[in-house]
Amino acid sequence: FRAQGIGGNVVFVASKNGLAASPNAAAYCTAKAAEIHLARCLALEGAEAQIRVNVVNPDAVLRGSKIWTGSWKQERAEAYNMKTDELEEHYRKRSLLKRSVFPEDIAEAIYFLASEMSAKSTGNILNVDAGNAQSFTR
């Protein structure tokens, strides 16, 4: 971006776990927190060259996500002491808006941050989680 001299735009996709700790996920939470901090550092370093850097933080994306594959779904259900078919409703109910998060929601957030609609935004975190209070930006 710098060599081209025309600015640029980077959007990281991190996770709610970059802001909120979870049991048995220390490595994942730490990696996502580092990703968020890297984005903020790069926003500082790139601003003079008009390079914007922002972060999208999804939580519990209900389709096309690891949440619904392999043994992970069963492990999550067991951790919450429920059946696997109750898990989607659990994720919906724990959000403030009581709504599910889908891949399209994440794509729209990325599009927004990559577009001119957010031309004056850099170093920001956009949580796409239907209002998970655990991940309120602090």
PLM feature segments, named:
Residues 47, 52, 121-123:
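Short, small/polar-rich loop/turn modules that mediate ligand/substrate recognition or access, typified
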Residues 110-111, 122-138:
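Short C-terminal tail/terminal secondary-structure segment
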Residues 31, 39:
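Active-site helix of classical SDR
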Residues 48, 61-94, 137-138:
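A glycine/serine/threonine-rich, flexible loop-to-helix segment
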